[in-house]
Amino acid sequence: MLTVNTATAPADLGPGWRSGIDKRPSSEALSVRAPGPRQGGLGSGVVGDSICDPRHHGGDDQAVYAYAREDLDDWQSRLDREITNGVFGENITTSDVDVTNCLVGERWSIGSDGLMLEATSPRTPCKTFSTWLGIPGWIKTFTAGGVPGAYFRVITPGTMRAGDRIEVVDRPDHSVTIGMVFRALMLEPE
């Protein structure tokens, strides 16, 4: 894991529009726990992280969002602009882990104190993401790119910090990847 990223202060995207998308790398070990339901829960699974729109973000099935540095590098090249760790709103920026091709239900062990996460779904791009990046047509561009990153639920709470090892410890007996679900939802709904 390259970085663990949190939004400690909400980004102001316009009148009455605040978001937790402005995530920055942390040098600290951060606690991770199941946040409960979207409505009335704790929001993010990463303690200290901000979720400002619980109708669409956070909760047990979107407790932690991961994105691969290799995919950020590809976007950096395509967009000809710097893409820093956390700028896509990810809590975890990985290296040498294929996030898009992980299986729904795949379990990751992170660090050494028992933190266990399970892949649940891809990110679907939204107006907040587009406004944050300030790229015209970003929702269509991101969707066409086909590398959405993955949301995870917390199976076993623990801590994580930059440099922790991510180990795939269980892969379900099916072939449904995060990328496949993304394509089915966004590109090939029939």
Where are these regions (language model features)?
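Electropositive, beta-rich accessory/interaction domains or terminal extensions
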Residues: M1-G111, L115-T128, D170-E190
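Loop/turn positions that initiate beta-strands
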Residues: G105, P157, R161-D164
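A structural signal for small-residue-enriched, beta-sheet-centric alpha/beta enzyme cores
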Residues: V147-P148, D164-I166
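Glycine-rich active-site loops that engage anionic ligands at enzyme catalytic sites
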Residues: E106-T156
